[in-house]
UniProtKB/Swiss-Prot annotation:
GO terms for biological process: diaminopimelate biosynthetic process; lysine biosynthetic process via diaminopimelate. This is N-acetyldiaminopimelate deacetylase. Its EC number is 3.5.1.47. InterPro entries: AcetylDAP_deacetylase, Amidohydrolase, Bact_exopeptidase_dim_dom, Peptidase_M20, Peptidase_M20_dimer. It comes from Lactiplantibacillus plantarum (strain ATCC BAA-793 / NCIMB 8826 / WCFS1) (Lactobacillus plantarum). Catalyzes the conversion of N-acetyl-diaminopimelate to diaminopimelate and acetate. It is an enzyme of class 3 (hydrolase). PANTHER family: N-ACETYLDIAMINOPIMELATE DEACETYLASE, PEPTIDASE M20 FAMILY MEMBER. The keyword Membrane does not apply. It catalyses: N-acetyl-(2S,6S)-2,6-diaminopimelate + H2O = (2S,6S)-2,6-diaminopimelate + acetate.
Length: 384
């Protein structure tokens, strides 16, 4: 049976009630498998991954097997205490689907159910991926080897819900949709001492302040003004009391850039400046830059041009050309390995993603299912 709105909204509501942190999505996985297990199995092969044990892969065997189209959804939630007042609010204290991955999963199930009933022209691989929020789940999935061989897609698609777009609208653009991100963690070590004898100590408040100040020059003086880059240092701790010179400091922040080349350029400047501050202030700085799998989501030109043209010509789709977002998304790793397109699906919420009050409009679910079953059928037909 093809899942329709009357099926998918209760599925969404149940998923919303059982949010789980990345790599812990066992109840979510079991529920997804129960839904997938009720679909016609004639063309389906279901696979789990021992080294990524909450992931699910489903292959739909097409009429031909020399091309594969991939579709990915994320399945994890956030450590947020829900404040929506919904009758189907989270039953897991301190965890919430505040980023809409419950919407993502519901749409994916709807699309999968269609192709389980309507055999596609080519093979399709549906990926229910854990740990988008916290542990580079896309990279883990790819590097697990589970996609190797006849599970590896030739092209791949995914979406993210967008509270700033009208319900059901499809938003996309050529080029980068999401920025690549990189965590900055710097631990400074000097020598503590009495405030009355600064010459006998090595003050990490002063060294840390210099590091913060100098890192802020990167975007202003080392990044082409026509391109985009962000260096934000949101955490700086040092010292215990006002009359003791701090011998330790911790600085944490983030890099954002719309291309991987710019991200790497900024990372190099962070390293160089940090080395200079350590030398200038005669201290040790343990610098860790952690990008993981959070590469920029750079849409493939040819595939995305076809996606945009198709959506613009579909009278049932409200297509909106969007600007790049400086938020991160680990689909960036997958799309660097497999050409494809990511897009936005509007859910029209007054609250932002990651808000404890975020409530998407569920009418978007069928809009996403209908648009993507139609488009993926079109993509299949190109390779039959």
């Amino acid at each position: 049976m093809v899942l329709r709105e009357t099926d998918l909204i209760p599925i969404y509501q149940h998923l919303h009630q059982i949010p789980e942190i990345g790599l812990q999505e066992h109840e979510t996985q079991a529920y997804l498998l129960s839904i997938i297990g009720k679909m016609p199995q004639e063309w389906l092969t279901i696979k789990t991954i021992p080294t990524l044990d909450t992931a699910i892969l489903v292959k739909v065997s097409g009429l031909k097997h020399d091309y594969r189209i991939g579709y990915r959804t994320d399945i994890d939630a956030l450590p947020v205490t829900e404040n929506t007042g919904l009758p189907f609010a989270s039953t897991h204290p301190g965890v919430m689907h505040a980023c809409g991955h419950d919407i993502h999963m519901s749409v994916a199930l709807g699309i999968l159910s269609y192709f389980a009933e309507n055999r596609p022209a080519t093979d399709m691989v549906f990926m229910f991926q854990p740990a988008e929020e916290n542990a580079s789940g896309g990279q883990r999935l790819y590097e697990s080897g589970a996609l190797d061989g006849d599970w590896m897609p030739d092209e791949i698609f995914a979406f993210h819900d967008n509270p700033n777009l009208p319900t059901g609208a499809i938003g996309c653009r050529m080029g980068t949709l999401f920025a690549g991100t990189c965590e900055i963690h710097a631990h400074l070590s000097g020598k503590s001492g009495h405030a009355a004898y600064p010459h006998q100590a090595n003050d990490m408040v002063v060294a840390g302040a210099a590091l913060v100040s100098q890192l802020q020059t990167i975007v202003a003086r080392n990044v082409d003004p026509i391109q985009s880059g962000v260096v934000t240092l949101g955490h700086f701790t040092a010292g215990t009391i006002g009359n003791v010179i701090a011998g330790e400091a911790q600085i944490d922040g983030t890099i954002r850039a719309l291309t991987q080349e710019m991200n790497m350029h900024i990372q190099r400047r962070v390293r160089t400046i940090t080395e200079g501050i350590a030398l200038a202030y005669d201290c040790n700085i343990d610098l860790k830059l952690n990008q993981g799998g959070y590469y920029p989501v750079e849409n493939n030109d040819a595939i995305t041009a076809d996606f945009i043209k198709y959506m613009q010509e579909d009278d049932d789709v409200n297509f909106i050309e969007t600007e790049p977002a400086m938020t991160g998304e680990d689909f960036g790793y997958l799309i660097h390995q497999i050409p494809g397109t990511m897009f936005w699906l509007g859910v029209d919420s007054p609250y932002s993603l990651h808000s404890e009050n975020m409530v998407p409009h569920t009418a978007a679910i069928m809009s996403g299912v209908n648009a993507m079953t139609s488009f993926l059928t079109h993509r299949n037909a190109l390779h039959k």
